[in-house]
Protein backbone atom coordinates (compact mmCIF):
# COMPACT_ATOMS: atom_id res chain seq x y z
CA UNK A 1 0.00 0.00 0.00
CA UNK A 2 1.40 3.40 -1.04
CA UNK A 3 2.19 6.26 1.30
CA UNK A 4 -0.82 8.49 1.94
CA UNK A 5 -0.64 11.92 0.32
CA UNK A 6 -1.27 15.05 2.35
CA UNK A 7 -2.22 18.56 1.26
CA UNK A 8 -2.72 21.75 3.26
CA UNK A 9 -5.17 24.20 1.70
CA UNK A 10 -5.50 27.85 2.68
CA UNK A 11 -7.38 30.98 1.65
CA UNK A 12 -10.00 33.19 3.20
CA UNK A 13 -11.49 36.57 3.97
CA UNK A 14 -14.21 36.46 1.31
CA UNK A 15 -16.18 33.62 -0.30
CA UNK A 16 -14.15 34.07 -3.50
CA UNK A 17 -11.02 32.94 -1.62
CA UNK A 18 -12.76 29.79 -0.35
CA UNK A 19 -15.27 28.37 -2.86
CA UNK A 20 -12.61 27.43 -5.48
CA UNK A 21 -10.85 25.41 -2.75
CA UNK A 22 -14.15 23.69 -1.94
CA UNK A 23 -14.58 22.95 -5.67
CA UNK A 24 -11.20 21.16 -5.70
CA UNK A 25 -11.75 19.05 -2.57
CA UNK A 26 -13.75 16.10 -4.01
CA UNK A 27 -11.24 15.63 -6.85
CA UNK A 28 -8.30 15.82 -4.42
CA UNK A 29 -9.92 13.26 -2.11
CA UNK A 30 -10.56 11.02 -5.11
CA UNK A 31 -6.86 11.34 -6.00
CA UNK A 32 -6.01 10.06 -2.50
CA UNK A 33 -5.16 13.30 -0.68
CA UNK A 34 -5.79 13.84 3.01
CA UNK A 35 -6.80 17.52 3.34
CA UNK A 36 -6.16 19.92 6.23
CA UNK A 37 -7.30 23.55 5.99
CA UNK A 38 -5.51 26.49 7.60
CA UNK A 39 -7.51 29.72 7.88
CA UNK A 40 -7.99 32.57 10.33
CA UNK A 41 -9.48 32.02 13.78
CA UNK A 42 -12.92 33.42 12.98
CA UNK A 43 -12.96 34.21 9.26
CA UNK A 44 -15.96 33.26 7.10
CA UNK A 45 -13.82 30.41 5.72
CA UNK A 46 -14.08 28.56 9.08
CA UNK A 47 -17.82 27.92 8.75
CA UNK A 48 -17.63 27.13 5.02
CA UNK A 49 -14.81 24.58 5.43
CA UNK A 50 -16.16 22.91 8.58
CA UNK A 51 -19.43 22.34 6.66
CA UNK A 52 -17.34 20.16 4.27
CA UNK A 53 -16.14 17.98 7.22
CA UNK A 54 -12.53 18.96 6.55
CA UNK A 55 -10.15 19.44 9.54
CA UNK A 56 -9.78 23.21 10.07
CA UNK A 57 -7.03 24.98 12.04
CA UNK A 58 -7.13 28.71 12.77
CA UNK A 59 -4.02 30.92 12.93
CA UNK A 60 -3.38 34.57 13.72
CA UNK A 61 -3.82 36.83 10.69
CA UNK A 62 -3.78 40.53 9.89
CA UNK A 63 -4.60 42.64 6.87
CA UNK A 64 -2.01 44.54 4.84
CA UNK A 65 -3.59 47.84 3.80
CA UNK A 66 -2.67 50.43 1.19
CA UNK A 67 -4.20 53.22 3.32
CA UNK A 68 -3.63 54.63 6.80
CA UNK A 69 -5.26 52.74 9.65
CA UNK A 70 -4.11 52.36 13.25
CA UNK A 71 -4.30 48.58 12.75
CA UNK A 72 -1.37 48.93 10.32
CA UNK A 73 0.84 49.11 13.42
CA UNK A 74 -0.51 45.95 15.07
CA UNK A 75 -1.40 43.74 12.09
CA UNK A 76 2.21 43.02 10.97
CA UNK A 77 2.77 41.41 14.39
CA UNK A 78 -0.35 39.27 13.87
CA UNK A 79 1.01 38.17 10.48
CA UNK A 80 4.40 37.33 12.05
CA UNK A 81 2.65 35.33 14.76
CA UNK A 82 0.66 33.52 12.04
CA UNK A 83 3.90 32.76 10.18
CA UNK A 84 5.36 31.13 13.30
CA UNK A 85 2.15 29.15 13.88
CA UNK A 86 2.09 28.04 10.22
CA UNK A 87 5.70 26.78 10.42
CA UNK A 88 4.84 24.72 13.53
CA UNK A 89 1.69 23.31 11.89
CA UNK A 90 3.44 22.38 8.64
CA UNK A 91 6.22 20.62 10.57
CA UNK A 92 3.57 18.67 12.47
CA UNK A 93 1.25 17.86 9.52
CA UNK A 94 4.13 17.22 7.05
CA UNK A 95 2.06 17.86 3.89
CA UNK A 96 3.45 16.97 0.47
CA UNK A 97 2.13 20.23 -0.98
CA UNK A 98 0.32 23.46 -0.02
CA UNK A 99 -2.43 25.00 -2.18
CA UNK A 100 -3.47 28.61 -1.58
CA UNK A 101 -6.44 30.56 -2.93
CA UNK A 102 -5.23 33.90 -1.60
CA UNK A 103 -6.49 36.37 0.96
CA UNK A 104 -4.31 37.68 3.77
CA UNK A 105 -4.46 34.55 5.93
CA UNK A 106 -2.71 32.65 3.12
CA UNK A 107 0.48 34.76 3.10
CA UNK A 108 2.08 33.32 6.29
CA UNK A 109 1.10 29.78 5.22
CA UNK A 110 2.74 30.04 1.77
CA UNK A 111 5.89 31.70 3.16
CA UNK A 112 6.04 29.05 5.91
CA UNK A 113 5.84 26.35 3.20
CA UNK A 114 8.91 27.85 1.51
CA UNK A 115 10.73 27.92 4.86
CA UNK A 116 9.85 24.23 5.38
CA UNK A 117 10.84 23.28 1.77
CA UNK A 118 7.26 22.25 0.94
CA UNK A 119 6.13 23.12 -2.61
CA UNK A 120 3.30 25.68 -2.65
CA UNK A 121 0.90 26.42 -5.49
CA UNK A 122 -1.22 29.55 -5.46
CA UNK A 123 -4.26 30.53 -7.54
CA UNK A 124 -4.89 34.11 -8.63
CA UNK A 125 -8.47 34.76 -9.71
CA UNK A 126 -8.26 38.38 -10.82
CA UNK A 127 -6.60 39.89 -13.88
CA UNK A 128 -3.93 41.60 -11.76
CA UNK A 129 -2.60 39.85 -8.63
CA UNK A 130 -3.84 41.20 -5.30
CA UNK A 131 -1.42 42.37 -2.60
CA UNK A 132 -1.58 39.11 -0.62
CA UNK A 133 -0.71 36.99 -3.67
CA UNK A 134 1.98 39.44 -4.83
CA UNK A 135 3.76 38.77 -1.52
CA UNK A 136 2.98 35.03 -1.52
CA UNK A 137 4.30 34.51 -5.09
CA UNK A 138 7.83 34.66 -3.64
CA UNK A 139 7.15 31.46 -1.72
CA UNK A 140 5.29 29.63 -4.52
CA UNK A 141 6.55 27.05 -7.01
CA UNK A 142 3.64 27.63 -9.41
CA UNK A 143 0.95 30.29 -9.85
CA UNK A 144 -2.37 29.33 -11.48
CA UNK A 145 -4.43 32.06 -13.10
CA UNK A 146 -7.88 32.62 -14.49
CA UNK A 147 -7.41 35.07 -17.35
CA UNK A 148 -4.89 35.01 -20.24
CA UNK A 149 -4.28 38.71 -19.48
CA UNK A 150 -2.83 37.78 -16.06
CA UNK A 151 0.14 35.85 -17.47
CA UNK A 152 2.12 39.04 -18.16
CA UNK A 153 1.95 40.05 -14.47
CA UNK A 154 3.41 36.75 -13.22
CA UNK A 155 6.92 35.21 -13.31
CA UNK A 156 7.02 33.28 -16.62
CA UNK A 157 8.58 30.17 -15.02
CA UNK A 158 5.74 29.96 -12.46
CA UNK A 159 2.62 31.05 -14.38
CA UNK A 160 0.06 28.49 -15.61
CA UNK A 161 -3.33 29.32 -17.15
CA UNK A 162 -5.87 27.00 -15.50
CA UNK A 163 -9.14 28.92 -15.28
CA UNK A 164 -11.21 28.87 -12.10
CA UNK A 165 -12.34 25.66 -10.34
CA UNK A 166 -16.15 25.56 -10.36
CA UNK A 167 -18.10 23.46 -7.83
CA UNK A 168 -19.61 20.53 -9.71
CA UNK A 169 -22.85 20.73 -7.73
CA UNK A 170 -23.58 24.13 -9.34
CA UNK A 171 -24.54 22.23 -12.49
CA UNK A 172 -27.14 20.03 -10.79
CA UNK A 173 -29.51 22.54 -9.16
CA UNK A 174 -33.25 21.92 -8.90
CA UNK A 175 -35.26 24.88 -10.24
CA UNK A 176 -38.53 23.60 -8.72
CA UNK A 177 -36.89 23.44 -5.28
CA UNK A 178 -35.88 27.11 -5.69
CA UNK A 179 -39.48 28.06 -6.60
CA UNK A 180 -40.64 26.50 -3.32
CA UNK A 181 -37.77 27.97 -1.27
CA UNK A 182 -38.42 31.47 -2.65
CA UNK A 183 -42.20 31.20 -2.25
CA UNK A 184 -42.95 32.12 -5.86
CA UNK A 185 -46.56 31.36 -6.86
CA UNK A 186 -45.63 29.71 -10.19
CA UNK A 187 -43.01 29.73 -12.98
CA UNK A 188 -44.90 32.06 -15.30
CA UNK A 189 -42.27 34.82 -15.28
CA UNK A 190 -38.52 34.77 -15.96
CA UNK A 191 -36.35 34.97 -12.83
CA UNK A 192 -33.76 37.67 -12.15
CA UNK A 193 -31.05 36.71 -9.62
CA UNK A 194 -29.27 39.61 -7.90
CA UNK A 195 -25.99 38.87 -6.11
CA UNK A 196 -24.06 41.63 -4.37
CA UNK A 197 -21.08 39.55 -3.21
CA UNK A 198 -20.63 37.80 0.14
CA UNK A 199 -20.93 41.06 2.12
CA UNK A 200 -23.65 42.59 -0.06
CA UNK A 201 -23.66 45.88 -1.94
CA UNK A 202 -25.56 48.95 -0.74
CA UNK A 203 -25.39 50.57 -4.19
CA UNK A 204 -26.91 47.53 -5.94
CA UNK A 205 -29.47 46.89 -3.16
CA UNK A 206 -30.69 50.50 -3.22
CA UNK A 207 -30.88 50.71 -7.03
CA UNK A 208 -32.79 47.42 -7.31
CA UNK A 209 -35.28 48.29 -4.56
CA UNK A 210 -36.05 51.68 -6.14
CA UNK A 211 -37.18 50.00 -9.38
CA UNK A 212 -38.86 46.92 -7.87
CA UNK A 213 -42.37 47.84 -9.13
CA UNK A 214 -41.07 48.06 -12.72
CA UNK A 215 -38.94 44.90 -12.45
CA UNK A 216 -41.76 42.87 -10.89
CA UNK A 217 -44.01 43.59 -13.89
CA UNK A 218 -41.79 41.27 -15.95
CA UNK A 219 -39.71 39.17 -13.52
CA UNK A 220 -39.71 37.22 -10.30
CA UNK A 221 -36.70 38.38 -8.28
CA UNK A 222 -34.25 36.53 -6.02
CA UNK A 223 -32.19 39.14 -4.16
CA UNK A 224 -29.10 38.04 -2.17
CA UNK A 225 -28.49 41.31 -0.36
CA UNK A 226 -25.76 40.50 2.20
CA UNK A 227 -25.65 40.25 5.99
CA UNK A 228 -27.83 42.81 7.78
CA UNK A 229 -29.29 44.17 4.53
CA UNK A 230 -32.81 42.68 4.51
CA UNK A 231 -35.58 45.26 4.05
CA UNK A 232 -38.39 44.47 6.51
CA UNK A 233 -40.86 46.62 4.52
CA UNK A 234 -40.54 44.30 1.52
CA UNK A 235 -41.27 41.04 3.35
CA UNK A 236 -44.22 39.21 1.84
CA UNK A 237 -44.05 41.11 -1.48
CA UNK A 238 -45.23 38.58 -4.09
CA UNK A 239 -42.53 37.67 -6.60
CA UNK A 240 -39.67 39.17 -4.52
CA UNK A 241 -37.55 36.85 -2.37
CA UNK A 242 -34.73 38.43 -0.34
CA UNK A 243 -32.02 36.56 1.57
CA UNK A 244 -28.86 37.70 3.33
CA UNK A 245 -26.83 34.89 1.78
CA UNK A 246 -27.40 31.53 0.13
CA UNK A 247 -25.17 28.49 0.53
CA UNK A 248 -26.67 25.08 -0.29
CA UNK A 249 -29.73 26.74 -1.91
CA UNK A 250 -27.60 28.73 -4.38
CA UNK A 251 -27.32 25.84 -6.85
CA UNK A 252 -31.13 25.65 -7.09
CA UNK A 253 -31.38 29.44 -7.45
CA UNK A 254 -28.89 29.36 -10.33
CA UNK A 255 -30.92 26.60 -12.00
CA UNK A 256 -34.06 28.76 -11.77
CA UNK A 257 -32.47 32.08 -12.81
CA UNK A 258 -32.84 33.31 -16.39
CA UNK A 259 -30.36 36.16 -15.88
CA UNK A 260 -28.27 37.74 -13.13
CA UNK A 261 -27.06 41.07 -11.81
CA UNK A 262 -23.76 40.66 -9.98
CA UNK A 263 -20.59 42.26 -8.68
CA UNK A 264 -17.59 41.29 -10.79
CA UNK A 265 -15.50 39.20 -8.40
CA UNK A 266 -13.59 36.67 -10.49
CA UNK A 267 -15.10 33.59 -8.90
CA UNK A 268 -18.68 34.88 -9.23
CA UNK A 269 -18.32 35.78 -12.91
CA UNK A 270 -16.63 32.47 -13.76
CA UNK A 271 -19.63 30.67 -12.24
CA UNK A 272 -22.00 32.77 -14.39
CA UNK A 273 -19.90 31.91 -17.46
CA UNK A 274 -19.83 28.18 -16.67
CA UNK A 275 -23.62 28.18 -16.21
CA UNK A 276 -24.22 30.32 -19.35
CA UNK A 277 -26.28 32.88 -17.42
CA UNK A 278 -26.80 36.23 -19.23
CA UNK A 279 -25.64 38.89 -16.80
CA UNK A 280 -25.17 42.54 -15.91
CA UNK A 281 -21.92 43.18 -14.02
CA UNK A 282 -21.68 46.16 -11.67
CA UNK A 283 -18.01 46.12 -10.58
CA UNK A 284 -16.84 47.66 -7.31
CA UNK A 285 -15.77 51.22 -8.11
CA UNK A 286 -12.08 52.15 -8.35
CA UNK A 287 -12.62 54.43 -5.33
CA UNK A 288 -13.72 51.47 -3.18
CA UNK A 289 -11.21 48.87 -4.44
CA UNK A 290 -7.96 48.33 -6.31
CA UNK A 291 -9.93 48.21 -9.57
CA UNK A 292 -9.67 44.45 -10.12
CA UNK A 293 -13.42 43.99 -10.60
CA UNK A 294 -13.46 46.67 -13.31
CA UNK A 295 -10.74 44.80 -15.23
CA UNK A 296 -12.53 41.46 -14.75
CA UNK A 297 -15.80 42.95 -16.01
CA UNK A 298 -14.19 44.61 -19.04
CA UNK A 299 -12.55 41.33 -20.04
CA UNK A 300 -15.94 39.57 -19.94
CA UNK A 301 -17.65 42.43 -21.80
CA UNK A 302 -14.99 42.30 -24.54
CA UNK A 303 -15.60 38.56 -24.99
CA UNK A 304 -19.37 39.11 -25.27
CA UNK A 305 -20.24 37.33 -21.99
CA UNK A 306 -21.52 40.31 -19.98
CA UNK A 307 -23.09 43.77 -20.02
CA UNK A 308 -21.11 46.14 -17.79
CA UNK A 309 -22.75 48.96 -15.85
CA UNK A 310 -20.22 50.94 -13.80
CA UNK A 311 -21.34 51.93 -10.32
CA UNK A 312 -20.87 55.64 -11.10
CA UNK A 313 -23.44 55.24 -13.93
CA UNK A 314 -25.90 53.22 -11.82
CA UNK A 315 -29.30 54.96 -11.74
CA UNK A 316 -32.90 53.74 -11.85
CA UNK A 317 -33.03 54.41 -15.59
CA UNK A 318 -29.65 52.85 -16.52
CA UNK A 319 -30.46 49.73 -14.51
CA UNK A 320 -33.86 49.23 -16.16
CA UNK A 321 -32.46 49.78 -19.65
CA UNK A 322 -29.57 47.35 -18.95
CA UNK A 323 -32.05 44.67 -17.81
CA UNK A 324 -34.10 45.18 -21.00
CA UNK A 325 -30.99 45.11 -23.19
CA UNK A 326 -29.61 41.88 -21.72
CA UNK A 327 -32.92 40.04 -21.48
CA UNK A 328 -33.90 40.93 -25.07
CA UNK A 329 -30.49 39.76 -26.33
CA UNK A 330 -30.07 36.83 -23.95
CA UNK A 331 -29.60 34.28 -26.75
CA UNK A 332 -26.57 36.22 -28.05
CA UNK A 333 -24.94 36.20 -24.60
CA UNK A 334 -25.69 32.49 -24.06
CA UNK A 335 -24.18 31.63 -27.48
CA UNK A 336 -20.96 33.57 -26.72
CA UNK A 337 -20.60 31.81 -23.35
CA UNK A 338 -21.36 28.37 -24.82
CA UNK A 339 -18.63 28.89 -27.45
CA UNK A 340 -16.00 30.08 -24.96
CA UNK A 341 -14.19 26.73 -24.86
CA UNK A 342 -13.70 26.59 -21.11
CA UNK A 343 -10.93 24.53 -19.59
CA UNK A 344 -11.16 21.58 -17.23
CA UNK A 345 -9.80 23.72 -14.40
CA UNK A 346 -10.20 21.11 -11.67
CA UNK A 347 -8.44 18.41 -13.69
CA UNK A 348 -5.60 20.77 -14.67
CA UNK A 349 -5.00 21.97 -11.10
CA UNK A 350 -5.14 18.46 -9.58
CA UNK A 351 -2.54 17.27 -12.13
CA UNK A 352 -0.35 20.25 -11.23
CA UNK A 353 -0.69 19.45 -7.51
CA UNK A 354 0.25 15.81 -8.21
CA UNK A 355 3.30 16.94 -10.20
CA UNK A 356 4.54 18.84 -7.11
CA UNK A 357 3.80 16.01 -4.65
CA UNK A 358 7.01 14.43 -3.44
Language model regions located:
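Active-site-proximal region of nucleotide-activated glycan assembly enzymes
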Residues: 6, 34, 44, 55, ...
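Donor-nucleotide binding loops and adjacent catalytic segments primarily
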Residues: 43, 48-52, 175-180, 184-260, ...
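Acidic donor-binding loop of glycosyltransferase active sites
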Residues: 95-97, 243, 255-270, 277-278
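C-terminal alpha-helical cap of glycosyltransferases
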Residues: 342-358
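Glycosyltransferases and closely related glycan-assembly transferases
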Residues: 85-98, 106-121, 134-139
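A short, well-ordered alpha-helix in the C-terminal region of glycosyltransferases
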Residues: 331-343
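Conserved nucleotide-sugar phosphate-binding/catalytic loop shared by glycosyltransferases and other
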Residues: 4-12, 29-78, 87, 310-312
Amino acid sequence: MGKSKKIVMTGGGTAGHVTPNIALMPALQQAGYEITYIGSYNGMEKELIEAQNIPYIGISSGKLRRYFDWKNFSDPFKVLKGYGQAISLLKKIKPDVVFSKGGFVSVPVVLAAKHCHIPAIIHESDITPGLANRIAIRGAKKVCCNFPETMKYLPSDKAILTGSPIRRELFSGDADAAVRYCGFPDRNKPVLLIVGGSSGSKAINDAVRKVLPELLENFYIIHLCGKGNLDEHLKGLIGYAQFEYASAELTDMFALADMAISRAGANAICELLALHKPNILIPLSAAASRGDQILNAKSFEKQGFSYVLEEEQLTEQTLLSAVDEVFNNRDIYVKAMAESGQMDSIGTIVKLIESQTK
